[in-house]
A protein has these predicted regions:
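Proline/serine/threonine-rich low-complexity linkers at boundaries of modular beta-sandwich domains
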Residues: 27, 42-47
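Sec-dependent bacterial lipoprotein signal peptides
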Residues: 1-18
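Contiguous beta-strand segments within globular domains
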Residues: 50-78
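Short, solvent-exposed, Trp/other aromatic-anchored flexible loops in extracytoplasmic proteins
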Residues: 102-147
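Bacterial Sec signal peptide processing site at the extreme N-terminus
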Residues: 15-32
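Short beta-strand elements
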Residues: 148-180
Length: 180
């Protein structure tokens, strides 16, 4: 009987653990890419040259104006030299270059960079103000000094609650966006 109780408890914990799911997401160029996620979080992408450490949105407020920008961090493998790092948003019909670093610097074994600031308004960043869940997909490409290129795709997902938290961080005027 005692073993049966422990088995039930153990199965309860296993049943509560988020399962890994593979999800196909369409990207620019009429293609789709498979992503692994656990719960609502996508697994960080990696290949034999580098691994994604961070891909996410940050907020910035100055002089009463609200901004957002993307922040990316990768960790190159020990034998990988960086000559150029490019990050493209491939969520839409065409890729959009958001970062091109022609002189990447490694600090504490990582490369990190932020995109330019974008005004956080419903007209300029409409997905942030939509109540629907949003998935953004980025292609991160590393070019090495010998011209060798390698790329990974990284997805990020924002549900309605996460978007609301971003708007709260930015300021009271963005907490209740206008109805579309």
């Amino acid at each position: 009987m005692r073993h049966a109780i422990w088995l039930v408890i153990l199965l309860g914990f296993v049943g509560c653990a988020p399962q890994e799911i593979t999800e196909q997401i369409p990207i620019a160029g009429h293609r789709s890419v498979a992503f692994r996620r656990i719960g609502n979080e996508f697994v960080k992408a990696e290949n034999d040259r580098f691994a994604v450490v961070e891909a996410g949105l940050t907020t910035y407020r100055t002089e009463g104006k609200n901004f957002v920008r993307w922040q990316f961090t990768i960790r190159p493998r020990p034998d990988t030299q960086l000559a150029v790092v490019e990050v493209e948003d491939v969520t839409g019909r065409r890729p959009v270059l958001i970062i091109k670093d022609d002189h990447p610097q490694i600090e504490e074994l990582q490369w990190s960079q932020q995109s330019p600031l974008a005004r956080a308004t419903p007209a300029l960043v409409p997905w942030l103000f939509s109540p629907d869940e949003t998935t953004r997909v980025f292609r991160i490409t590393v070019t090495e000094p010998d011209g060798k290129q390698s790329s990974v795709y990284q997805a990020t997902r924002y549900n309605a609650e996460a978007k609301k938290k971003f708007r709260v961080l930015m300021g009271p005027e963005l907490q209740n966006p206008p109805a579309s």
